[in-house]
């Protein structure tokens, strides 16, 4: 039987501060590291042999997976893909969610966060939080880097990546070494 295990990163420093994070490289906090350890323990309890690991480029996701692999005593290589990144929140990036509700109104912030095809205003390319200014994304083609994304944009990016994986990547079990 094949499994697809999806794990969200553990709590990050900005999650705790209630900030829009998006593509900014924010690390896990202590609680996030404990959550990742627990996720690893839960997977280990199920005795699932994991063939392939994939992660977004984001530090919080990478470190969550690293901790999970430590719990599983598994050092298989990981395929990192920017296409698996979280949604890019545009001009909301780095801002406190509660402060933005006071400034823009709760309904407007809710629309930005939950509407299918509404994008927040784009993040200025000169902003230090823009992916063009973050070393993590230096090898991503500039035309692929968004200034903002809707949920629909994010969905389409991630589904396109998963679809390519599902239809082009054979399981290592199909081709034993």
Segments predicted by a language model, with ranges:
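Glycine-rich N-terminal loop/short-helix segment of MobA-like nucleotidyltransferase
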Residues: 11-26
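Short, basic/glycine-rich phosphate-binding loops at helix/coil junctions
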Residues: 18, 131-142
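Phosphate-coordination/substrate-recognition cap region in phosphate-metabolizing enzymes
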Residues: 39-131, 137, 148, 155, ...
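Single conserved hydrophobic/aromatic residue that forms the stacking wall/gate
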Residues: 167-170, 174-177
